[in-house]
């Protein structure tokens, strides 16, 4: 008995290996059906996004200044196997890619800086001023924002509307009195971001959980931009979204850096790190193991730094 299977995915490698035919939809519309054997990955992507992609990443037209926007020195977690003795800086208008293997403690380090995790030592300066960030509220007040890696668990407020999700982090600026919110300001904020970021949503009242992953991510970025942060930490900003939406997110990141925002981008996709970073910071086992200029970054030199594990005491003794 032969059975036909429908397999839904936006991972091109899976489609090429598993499928005989590929049916492509875009914005709720049927685009067409093709034999997988006769289509390259690039051709499938072009059909998905409705245009040819000459490059997977937009050109980086930002020019990082000499001004240090944030400096971190000797940042160490209270947990002995987490991040330790981490020091780095990011300049105004720079995209700093953060690379590393699973367990490198990249997310944990950034959550610590944002006030979500406790640390035993370390200092942080924003625009030359030493700051004491003990909780996320402190970070937000010092113009730092964090887009978390799991948008469903710690990002979107699923049962709330798109308008609520965009405005939730900037309610103080959206009040028209000590208690009441200014609905016109909120709707103007939503309309501005909908146009600027090409967010596909029927109405500001639409529940965010009904949107695609890419549109949810744009809403979360819009949420933080409403506070006009100087430093924007993006943890896996394109995880779980389709290739068309990825390119749109990349364009947003590139434009923010061009405007002078300092972007820290954690990514597990090596090509994303190489394609979207002015400079790459590599971590291994809780430590920063090196920095690479963006134009010099390759998979090989990133992996060399990402695998610089400290020798365990027992192993060191055995080798003597």
Predicted regions and their residues:
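Glycine-rich phosphate-binding loops of nucleotide-dependent enzymes
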Residues: 3-320
């Amino acid at each position: 008995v032969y059975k036909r299977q429908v397999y839904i995915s936006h991972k091109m490698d899976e489609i090429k290996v598993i499928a005989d035919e590929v049916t492509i939809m875009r914005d709720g519309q049927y685009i067409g059906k093709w034999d997988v054997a006769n289509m390259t990955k690039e051709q499938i992507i072009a059909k998905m996004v409705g245009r040819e992609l000459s490059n997977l990443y937009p050109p980086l037209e930002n020019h990082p200044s000499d001004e240090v926007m944030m400096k971190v020195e000797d940042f160490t977690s209270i947990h002995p196997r987490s991040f330790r003795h981490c020091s780095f800086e990011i300049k105004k208008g720079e995209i700093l890619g953060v690379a590393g293997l699973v367990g490198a403690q990249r997310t944990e380090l950034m959550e610590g800086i944002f006030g979500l995790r406790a640390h035993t030592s370390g200092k942080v300066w924003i625009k030359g001023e030493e700051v004491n960030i003990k909780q996320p509220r402190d970070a937000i007040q010092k113009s730092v924002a964090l887009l978390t890696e799991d948008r469903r668990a710690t990002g979107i407020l699923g049962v709330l509307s798109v308008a609520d999700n965009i405005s939730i982090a900037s309610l103080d600026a959206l009040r028209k009195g000590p208690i009441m919110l200014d609905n016109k300001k909120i709707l103007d904020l939503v309309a501005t971001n909908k146009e600027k970021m090409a967010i596909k949503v029927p109405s500001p009242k639409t529940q965010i959980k009904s949107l695609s992953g890419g549109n949810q991510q744009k809403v979360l970025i819009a949420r933080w931009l409403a506070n006009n942060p100087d430093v924007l930490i993006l943890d896996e900003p394109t995880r779980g979204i389709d290739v068309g939406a990825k390119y749109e997110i990349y364009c947003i990141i590139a434009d923010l850096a061009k405007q002078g925002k300092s972007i820290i981008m954690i990514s597990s996709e090596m090509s994303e790190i190489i394609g979207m970073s002015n400079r790459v910071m590599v971590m291994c086992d809780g430590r920063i193991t090196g920095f690479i200029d963006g134009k010099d970054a390759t998979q090989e030199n990133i992996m060399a730094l990402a695998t610089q594990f400290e020798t365990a005491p027992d192993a060191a003794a055995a080798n003597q």
